[in-house]
A protein has these predicted regions:
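Class I S-adenosyl-L-methionine-dependent methyltransferase catalytic core
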Residues: 2-13, 17-325
Length: 325
């Protein structure tokens, strides 16, 4: 049951659920002033819960009003509805097999961006291989999962992606007010050409490259590695690895997630081929982690196909932890 509060303008007792509607109906000028402040706080990165507490009104009312307004105005950003800032009962992984059936729903994390990795992965990597105030680079930032974690964990973050749409999504996902002093730098650019980063400047590289010709992230953007065939992809990954080792400090770590693919019923060991590219660039391999996949189609159509055509469904990826000597 919604709590009752006194209207600031007519002293009438109103439920929190109906407060905004009441002010809009009976105190229009005051309503417009309240909405002006609510919109400003929303655009500044405050969550709907923080806004609701500020004005002592119902959170659902704030969310609904901002959601409706943002649909009709480019000047009003999507409301941030965040129920928690960290995972429940989190513990660092301690073995070389990682499994996260729960995708993770803290902060702005969600699984709507195709191919993004579980936030448990960068959280583990960042906590294990960096310290507060360190500089963390994601060369394929996508929807910004890594940078949400750098901001939450008080690291300085840099994210790069060649797709302007991804950049827009990433910027929206990190715009929350919490730890604002750790707002990351997000740049539309090429993972193979990080000219704006000096040699030996980065403390940790933490990234999830696209897979060759699996999920296409654009309709033909020049330099989009997801559009390449396997041989072309591997050739360009060499340049990604060279840039990673150039910008990384000595003794620091570069961690990438990559998986295999299948062509004509046979496995192509893309993961190990990518690993070789990073070793050739000068890295040494510290850890090989098997990351179990939970979004593979193990029932229905694909299960039937795997039996009929005698192949196994790929249900793992590789998390390679490299070190710069």
């Amino acid at each position: 049951m919604s709590d009752k509060i006194l209207c600031d303008y007519c002293i009438k007792e109103i439920t929190q659920n109906n407060y905004l509607a009441h002010v809009q109906k009976f105190h229009e000028e005051n309503f417009l002033e309240i909405m002006k402040h609510i919109i400003q706080m929303n655009n500044d990165g405050y969550t709907t819960d923080e806004i609701a507490k500020k004005f002592n009104i119902n959170e659902s009312s704030v969310f609904k009003k901002l959601k409706d307004l943002s649909k009709n105005s480019n000047d009003i950003k999507e409301p941030l509805r965040i129920s928690k800032w960290e995972p429940h009962d989190f513990k660092l992984e301690a073995t070389t097999v990682w499994s996260f059936p729960d995708r993770g729903d803290w902060a702005t994390h969600n699984g709507t961006y195709r191919g993004n990795w579980s936030p448990y992965i960068p959280r583990n990597i960042i906590l294990r291989y960096s310290n507060e105030d360190d500089l963390v680079l994601d060369q394929f930032v996508g929807s910004g999962t890594t940078l949400v974690e750098t901001k939450l964990l008080k690291r300085k973050g840099i994210g790069v992606d060649i797709n302007p749409k991804a950049i827009e999504i990433a910027k929206n996902n990190v715009r929350f007010k919490k730890n604002n002093e750790y707002d990351p730098l997000i740049i539309c650019g090429d993972a193979r050409k990080l000219d704006f980063i000096d040699n030996n400047e980065v403390d940790l590289v933490c990234t999830h490259p696209p897979y060759a010709n699996i999920i296409k992230y654009s309709d033909g953007i020049k330099g989009d590695l997801s559009l390449l065939d396997i041989d072309e992809f591997l050739e360009e990954i060499k340049n990604v690895a060279k840039e990673a080792i150039r910008v990384l400090k000595k003794g620091k770590y570069c961690v990438i997630l990559i998986g295999d693919t299948r062509r004509h019923k046979h496995i192509i060991p893309l993961g190990f081929r990518v690993m070789d590219m990073f070793l050739e660039a000068g890295f040494v391999l510290k850890e090989t982690i098997i990351k179990e996949q939970h979004n593979c189609k193990s029932t229905g159509f694909w299960y039937k196909r795997s039996i009929e055509n005698n192949f196994l469904l790929i249900a793992h990826e590789y998390l390679f932890v490299f070190r710069k000597q």
